[in-house]
């Protein structure tokens, strides 16, 4: 089991620690609902240092990225980031990731913790272009400072203009007195904020300065359980639940990051799938009575026939209703369609809705 550079701090704060993707991670501090509310209304900090960071350099770096990812990275300018995925050869997804363009011929790829080795091997196997690849996942820490008060709370720590930083842009500069910190206007919560990347040896110093600066704003540490409820209220996919090596980006509602004006892994088959239409789709649904849908619960039709499976589900802390995502036949995927979730032998009515669940 790996620790992050901040494990001792989490333990000293009384965090409940659990194994996640091979790491000892804080799942909650004072409680999921309270932590969720802090991020929706104020500012909270997640240690997500388990995520992976790959650096690609060289004149063919973009060509390699274009070959293995579904989105069009040629559209990136320096200081911009892009959400994308790594399609496999079978019509599924190796991983979803964020691509950062640091400069021409210099990129950072941020991948899911559970897929670091798999992604590294996958991209390496396609690197016949002489691209210099470095896996620095074990050297970098990552904090997500999220919430509507994040910019204001952190502004005293940097000369980077946080308030006016466009979504999915980033700058590398001084933060909390440390140089070469990557400050990115990204996140997995839907409440705004930043993700900051820095060397492990700076982790405790940065953590302490963040909490000092954020104290007047009621800043709190947040665990992975609230990270999950926050992302689910936005309908953001979680790899391993909502997307995996058998789900196509088109089935998962990720057509917007699948660009067919270039060739990439399995693009011909995915293009054909787009033209012919998909047989199943990932839908968002809200329970119509008080009930909590959970991962792997069956989705059934009005006659009780199993038509799909819940991939993610929870009781929404912001809305106080059961919400979830799951794959159903395309005929059940239109908004307002009635579906039923099988919860301990009871089939409970749910309605297909448009994302996000949580409207600010």
Swiss-Prot record:
It is an enzyme of class 2 (transferase). It catalyses: N(6)-[(R)-S(8)-aminomethyldihydrolipoyl]-L-lysyl-[protein] + (6S)-5,6,7,8-tetrahydrofolate = N(6)-[(R)-dihydrolipoyl]-L-lysyl-[protein] + (6R)-5,10-methylene-5,6,7,8-tetrahydrofolate + NH4(+). SUPFAM superfamilies: Aminomethyltransferase beta-barrel domain, Folate-binding domain. GO terms for cellular component: cytosol; glycine cleavage complex. GO terms for biological process: glycine decarboxylation via glycine cleavage system. Keywords: Aminotransferase, Transferase. Its EC number is 2.1.2.10. InterPro entries: GCS_T (IPR006223), GCS_T_bac (IPR022903), GCST_C (IPR013977), GCV_T_N (IPR006222), GcvT/YgfZ/DmdA (IPR028896), GcvT/YgfZ_C (IPR029043), TrmE/GcvT_dom1 (IPR027266). Gene3D superfamilies: Aminomethyltransferase beta-barrel domains, Aminomethyltransferase fragment, Probable tRNA modification gtpase trme, domain 1. GO terms for molecular function: aminomethyltransferase activity; transaminase activity. The glycine cleavage system catalyzes the degradation of glycine. Belongs to the GcvT family. The glycine cleavage system is composed of four proteins: P, T, L and H. This is Aminomethyltransferase. The lineage of its organism: Bacteria, Pseudomonadati, Bacteroidota, Flavobacteriia, Flavobacteriales.
């Amino acid at each position: 089991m790996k620790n992050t550079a901040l494990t001792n701090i989490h333990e000293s704060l009384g965090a409940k620690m659990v194994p996640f993707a091979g790491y000892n991670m804080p799942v909650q501090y004072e409680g999921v609902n309270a932590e969720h509310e802090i991020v929706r209304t104020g500012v909270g900090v997640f240690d997500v240092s388990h995520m992976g960071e790959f650096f690609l350099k060289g004149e063919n770096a973009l060509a390699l990225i274009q070959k293995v990812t579904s989105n069009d990275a040629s559209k990136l300018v320096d200081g911009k980031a892009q959400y994308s995925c790594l399609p496999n050869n079978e019509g599924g997804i190796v991983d979803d990731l964020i691509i950062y363009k640091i400069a021409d011929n210099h990129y950072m790829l941020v991948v899911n913790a559970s897929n670091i080795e798999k992604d590294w091997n996958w991209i390496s196997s396609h690197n016949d272009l002489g691209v210099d690849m470095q896996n620095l996942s074990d050297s970098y820490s990552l904090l997500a400072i999220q919430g509507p008060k994040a910019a204001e709370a952190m502004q005293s720590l940097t000369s980077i203009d946080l308030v006016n930083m466009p979504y999915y842009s980033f700058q590398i500069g001084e933060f909390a007195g440390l140089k070469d910190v990557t400050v990115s206007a990204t996140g997995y919560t839907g409440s705004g904020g930043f993700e900051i990347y820095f060397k492990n040896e700076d982790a405790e110093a940065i953590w302490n300065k963040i909490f000092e600066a954020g104290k007047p704003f009621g800043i709190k540490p947040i665990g992975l359980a609230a990270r999950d409820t926050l992302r689910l209220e936005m309908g953001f996919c979680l790899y391993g639940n909502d997307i995996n090596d058998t789900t196509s980006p088109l089935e998962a509602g990720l057509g917007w990051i699948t660009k067919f004006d270039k060739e990439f892994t399995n693009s011909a088959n995915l293009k054909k799938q787009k033209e012919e239409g998909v047989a199943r789709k990932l839908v968002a649904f809200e329970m119509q009575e008080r009930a909590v849908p959970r991962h792997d619960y069956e989705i059934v039709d009005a006659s009780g026939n199993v038509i799909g499976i819940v991939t993610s589900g929870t009781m929404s802390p912001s809305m106080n209703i059961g919400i979830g995502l799951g794959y159903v036949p395309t005929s059940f995927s239109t908004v307002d369609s009635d579906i039923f979730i099988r919860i301990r032998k009871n089939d409970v009515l749910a309605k297909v809705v448009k994302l996000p669940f949580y409207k600010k």
